[in-house]
Amino acid sequence: MAGFGLPNFGQLTEAFKKAQQIQQNAQKLQEELEVMEIEGTNDDNRAKIWMSGNQKPLRVEIDPSLLSEGKAIIEEAILDAMKSAHEVSTSTMKERMEDLTGGFKLNLPGMGEEN
């Protein structure tokens, strides 16, 4: 059958073993990502947001001095902190997934280079 472009049995077995190993480690990785706390801040560090490694928002901290700046500045500071936390969280997840898969590109939704 190898003459028809199919992999030999040894290659197929090795591929299944690798997939099984990835699957076993994926659950552990999900648990690790869930308990991670990744901080994002705005430029002057007066707005902070923490997310898990799975991009779940965990908490927000606003410096009292920011509260006197007005609605638009507060909103921008929070948005900047959120973007920062999301960027670090997604890049951390991507790195950990690449470590898990040995660099094999999975092209998972939300894990691309676009932003």
Curated annotation (Swiss-Prot):
Molecular function per GO: DNA binding
Q: Which residues form the signal peptide?
A: none
In Pfam terms, one family for this protein is YbaB_DNA_bd
Coarse class of the primary localization is cytoplasm
Q: Which UniProt keywords apply?
A: Cytoplasm, DNA-binding
Binding partners and assembly: Homodimer.
Q: Which PANTHER family match?
A: NUCLEOID-ASSOCIATED PROTEIN YBAB
This molecule's function is given as: Binds to DNA and alters its conformation. May be involved in regulation of gene expression, nucleoid organization and DNA protection.
> What name does the UniProt record give this protein?
Nucleoid-associated protein PMN2A_1347
Q: What is the lineage of its organism?
A: Bacteria, Bacillati, Cyanobacteriota, Cyanophyceae, Synechococcales
